[in-house]
Amino acid sequence: MELKHSISDYTEAEFLQLVTTICNADTSSEEELVKLVTHFEEMTEHPSGSDLIYYPKEGDDDSPSGIVNTVKQWRAANGKSGFKQG
């Protein structure tokens, strides 16, 4: 999986693939998973970081698409760039 430099370099579908890979722990090693989680935290800039995945708030949609929607809504509400169109 190619890691991009900015969340705006990802389409929503590409970012969903990243989140799905993390949620399913579909990596060849623990080291690779940690790298993806760190990348998720850096790209989203969300104050909850990886807790969105591993320790979601009660009632939150903790599916990969729910996590992506949470990130998208938070970034929009905080004046941050969104996903690349396409």
From Swiss-Prot:
CDD domains: Col_Im_like. Pfam families: Colicin_Pyocin. InterPro entries: Colicin_E_sf, Colicin_pyocin. Disulfide bonds: none annotated. GO terms for biological process: bacteriocin immunity. GO terms for molecular function: protein domain specific binding; toxic substance binding. The keyword Ligase does not apply. Gene3D superfamilies: Colicin E immunity protein. One of its GO terms (cellular component) is protein-containing complex. Keywords: Bacteriocin immunity, Plasmid. It comes from the Bacteria. SUPFAM superfamilies: Colicin E immunity proteins. Belongs to the colicins ColE2/ColE8/ColE9 and pyocins S1/S2 family. This protein is able to protect a cell, which harbors the plasmid ColE9 encoding colicin E9, against colicin E9, it binds specifically to the DNase-type colicin and inhibits its bactericidal activity. This is Colicin-E9 immunity protein.
